[in-house]
Amino acid sequence: MAVSSCARAFPSFECRSDAEFSGGIPRHDIPNSGKASILSHGSSVHGLSSLIYRFPPNFVRQLSIKARRNCSNIGVAQVVAASWSNNNSSPDFTPVAKAVDAAAAAAAAIAPVDTTVVNEDVALVENETCNDQNVQFDSLPSMKYASFLNSDGSVAIHAGERLGRGIVTDAITTPVVNTSAYFFNKTSELIDFKEKRRASFEYGRYGNPTTVVLEEKISALEGAESTLLMASGMCASTVMLLALVPAGGHIVTTTDCYRKTRIFIETILPKMGITATVIDPADVGALELALNQKKVNLFFTESPTNPFLRCVDIELVSKLCHEKGALVCIDGTFATPLNQKALALGADLVLHSATKFLGGHNDVLAGCISGPLKLVSEIRNLHHILGGALNPNAAYLIIRGMKTLHLRVQQQNSTALRMAEILEAHPKVRHVYYPGLQSHPEHHIAKKQMTGFGGVVSFEVDGDLLTTAKFVDALKIPYIAPSFGGCESIVDQPAIMSYWDLSQSDRAKYGIMDNLVRFSFGVEDFDDLKADILQALDSI
């Protein structure tokens, strides 16, 4: 469930929608390639409210107005989740409930919500307009934000959330809907839902209102029609591969990548007859050769890659692959949507481990994949079968984390670039891998397709395995851990952290030397991090 597109699933009289913030954001830098439906300036939808915030006309509780306003976010969300109804027949409620409904009707009379349907592929149900995609609200074209909300930082804060607030709560934050299933008042409603005449949620594995908000937020940042959230980045990668590559198919991937992704491609996909060509990230000739010699279904790579931060020319490889009918999926975890817009560069799909920069606080596991509705729907269908659904509490943590995404990424970009330059000049550092450095083999590509170079720097210490471990142990600020992208700095020695089960010679086949260090810069003060790294280098 990515983008809520039920234009009038419930009457609008109880919505406090802000028209200036409704829907997605126009991505003016995205070519008209069918990957995102961007509205012209002449057509717009105002006041469109996300489904969880619309209250059906018979939704009442015997609460005073004051009590309703004081409901907690979670409590209100649970009440909302339990009250989906389009039944227009109203029983005889108490005077208090009637007073609340009267107040709601009066408020709506003062500020009615104007909803203009822009999607012609709709069904009319009891004077309500709802798309025919059932509860998978992916078919709505992007909506227009206010002109002053055109920066990624503002979008990361507001996208998907200021889509309308019910009068029960004036909460700024998005509620957490903790439920495993959603009920129907009567069988006729269930039949309408099954026959796609009524929009609703059904089961927790298929979608959650809190998760929808996060999917809309990520879609707005990526300029995507649809986004699907999953329980981890690896879940997103594996489900994408299983959904889009047929049995007996062929993919192209790169030498430098996350090891677990490589293991899945090398050991699991062959069981379905799927083969792979592995190329250097910069070897365009090898890609062309594979495209000409084989029926390639998909090109899948990271950019920047893990751990050497190699960069793929996304625009070029997308052009080459599309000419041969192959799809392109870019794992942009190291870049973030703020530093790189893979879809705008021509990729069909962009994937993230939201555990990293998007969540940004080292406290949640999640993955996401964004792109055109058709492709994401294919992945979604398999995901609903396999499971791996994201818990709504985890979705809330990422929503909260993304409100500071632009601040964190700006700090991490700056710290990483400055430290990369210092490390490159240090006599106890043999080599530095960072796309922001002119010495990086794909620096020219990174400059072309990235606005910032990320918060991770890899480098080789002048020493062996034990000397490098001594350097790591001498650091005071970063944690020794296997992740990156959070507020806290993290350091690891890949030869030990990720490849310790392989011999030194086998590690070397992947370029993993004993003296390699991967440093993820957090948001600590630059001078503190600089002093810590320099003292650790002085200790070896």
UniProtKB/Swiss-Prot annotation:
Which residue ranges traverse the bilayer? none
Main localisation: plastid
Tell me the cofactor note.
Answer: Binds 1 pyridoxal 5'-phosphate per subunit.
Q: Does the keyword Transit peptide apply?
A: yes
Pathway linked to the protein: Amino-acid biosynthesis; L-methionine biosynthesis via de novo pathway; L-cystathionine from O-succinyl-L-homoserine: step 1/1
Top EC class of this enzyme? transferase
- Which residues does the record list as N6-(pyridoxal phosphate)lysine (modified residue)? K356
EC id: 2.5.1.160
Q: What is this protein called?
A: Cystathionine gamma-synthase 1, chloroplastic
